[in-house]
Amino acid sequence: MLRRICLLDRPIPAPNHSTLKNILEYALTRDGVPYRPFGPARWGWGAYTFPDPDQPQRFLLIGLGWGSADPHYMDILDHLTPARLHESAAEAGIDWPSSKIQDDAPLLSPDMLLVRPITPIRVLESVPSGRRPAILQLNEDWTIALNRTMSYRLGRPFHLQMQQDHLFTATQVSVSSRPLSQTTRLPGITASFVLRAPTEFSHELSVVWASGLGANTGMGFGWIHDGLTPAPF
C-alpha cells in the first residue's frame, strides 16, 4: 500500500476536479502508465481542501494526494515528483513552486472515512442470469453489493459499512472507449458519506481509498476531503 500527498507552500483556489485528475494522469502516462478509461481503478487520488475564510462559498486547495494497492502503480507513483506535476499543470495555469511530497497523513479516524467521491460508484444487483442492473439507492442492498464487488475485485472479503451524509445524486459515468472515440456510459452514484469498517478490518478503508469503490471506475478514483485545514499535515 502506498499513499502520498503533495503539500503546497500556500493554499490556492481549488481548481475543478477534472483539472486535478488530468494533472496526475498526464504525469503518469509520461512515466509509462497506459491510459485505461475502462475497468476497475488501479489507483486513487484526493484533493485536500478547506473553506476560504474570506469567501466561505469558495474552497482552497492545500494538497493533492495519490495512492495505490497495485504493485505496478505503487512503484510508479512512488517516484512522482513536484516537477512532474508542475510540467503537467503548466498549461492549466497551476503552479507547485515550493511543494513537497510526503507520506500521506493517517486517516482522521482508524475505522472511519468521511469523504465525498468524485468518481461515480457503480455496483450491480446479484441476479441468476442476464444483465445485472445498477443499484442507485444507498441502502442495505447497495452496501452488500459494494462489499461483494470489492471482494470480487481484490480477492478477499470486505466488511465496509456506509452511513449516508447527504442525498445521493444519480449520474452517468464513462466506463469504456470504443472505436471512433465513442464511449459507453452506465449509471452510477455520487454522494457524501461516512464509510466505516469494524476495528479489526480498519485497513480496508486505506485499501478502498487507493483502489476505488465499485466497478468500472476508469483509470483513477477521485475523492474530495472538504473542510480539512493544513493542521493535520
Predicted regions and their residues:
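RNA-interacting cores
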Residues: 1-233
